[in-house]
Amino acid sequence: MRSDIIVIGGGAAGLVAAIGAARELAKTENGGTVTVLEKMPKAGRKVMITGKGRCNFTNVKEWGDFSDHIRTDVNFVSPSWHNLTPQGVMDLLKSVGLRSVVERGDRVFPESHMAGDVVDSLLRCCTLEGVKVVTDCEVKTIDPTPRGFSLDCVQTSRKQVRIPVDDPRKLRPGKPAPTREELTIEPVEYTCRKLIIATGGLSYPGTGSTGDGYLWAEEMGHRVAPCFPSLTALVPVGYKNLETNPLADEIKTAFRGRTVYGKTKERKIAPLPKWYPTFPAHIERIVPLSALGEQFNGNTLENVQLTLLVGGDAVQTEFGDIEFTDGGLEGPLGFMVSRRAVKALNDGQKVAVELDLKPAVEVEKLDADIHERWQEIIHDERSKGQSFHRLFRILLGKLIPWNLTIPFLDTHADVSVDTLAAALKAWRMDIAGFVGFERCVVTAGGIDTSEVVAKTLESKKQPGLYFAGEVLDMDCDTGGYNLQVAFSTGYLAGQSAAKALNNN
């Protein structure tokens, strides 16, 4: 099968790359064809889970402020961002009926707060632009040719077939007969003149992000910067029951498809590329919580200050909300410091976080307030006969969420009325590790951007090859920045491929 431009990957970057390419081709007399190859049964799987299913799809900060949230080469991202700005993304989606709202922190969501509406809008736009989206099509190999590229793929066809029932009387009246899914797998070859790789990184492998693009880039001469999880949960010491840790198998969870079988049918692991890392500090999300972790789980602290400590030194301070989940420390604050924390842990450094639960109050004023409240409590008629521990917990409950009073006391065995203010201003948690690719939001690392032309996103190693999205070595903070960069790089890659096609 032939297409003028093929995009591998039907995620945020891939779908918008196809839209950009199709729009550019439509400007010419002869036009052209654009095809998206997506290996999952449905396109946009990872977009569906962003923002806890609400999809924070962009951030409307101006470039000067937006660029402060890019953690890699800002100059590389700039041409893409200015070519398709956040307003441009909103306008693109609005053109197919998606209305959006701007919330705190300049974050933009669909008005419906449903990520599925964003995916549906992107697919609707693809249809209107004449883009062909082929799902269940996994690219196995890419071979450059004199006229472009040849792709060997595996196409899966799905069909529901009825399950035979030995006795028709067993069928429920008005209910359909039972069925099962029957798969048909066959090889198929695609050829194209221009190729865009937008396969994503390694995060959330269940959505299809399993590092395929890195392999192809490496085969075509590109360097891949070591990858590691970013925007991920940090796991405090004592938070998880590490005795049951199954010793996270990064290969199985984040690099599926690399397993091979020998003559004895024993499962073996194929050699990993040099860029693929393993992490001693990786703690699988499925590791059960400890008793302490259970007490933390499900709680949120709002408007607090978090300081990241590496080797005892404060290296990053952020203000906002933090969530205690079954993974560890998450939410905006946990995610904002996770990139730096993961790098430090991977380097073997000691990492800790320090929470200031009352950042707007000086310690002296807080101490005076605590003593005043304590006097009120101990002189209250209802306090008669109550134990000191009970009264102290009542005091603490007036200062922090009640559900966090027990874990706070469990981690501050020697705290007293006189030392409580200092403890609330510096709640220290040593970090044991982090959740890996299986549940991180974004992959840090990727294809070296110095080997890609920033103004076109074309490879400097292989003419006619373009890259977009998370597969590149670029990542941002949480807050809609990563999706915006995916959209922007996708659109520029698509336009550039189409323009190059027209000029040939």
Regions found by a protein language model. Name each.
Residues S203-W216, M220, M474-N502:
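A conserved FAD-binding loop/helix module that cradles the flavin
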Residues A13-A18, T199, G206-T207, A486:
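Short glycine/serine/threonine-rich phosphate/pyrophosphate-binding segments
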Residues S112-A115, L231-Y239, P277-H282, F434-E451:
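Flavin (FAD/FMN) cofactor-binding core of flavoprotein oxidoreductases
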Residues I6, A22-K52:
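Glycine-rich FAD pyrophosphate-binding loop
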Residues M1-A13:
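Beta1/beta-strand and adjacent pyrophosphate-binding region of the FAD-binding site
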Residues K39-K132, C137:
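Conserved N-terminal/central alpha/beta ligand/cofactor-binding core
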Residues K42, W63-D65, D73, H82, ...:
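Residue-level recognition of phosphate/Mg2+-coordinating polar/acidic sites
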Residues S121-F392, L396:
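Predominantly flavin-linked oxidoreductase catalytic cores and closely associated redox partners
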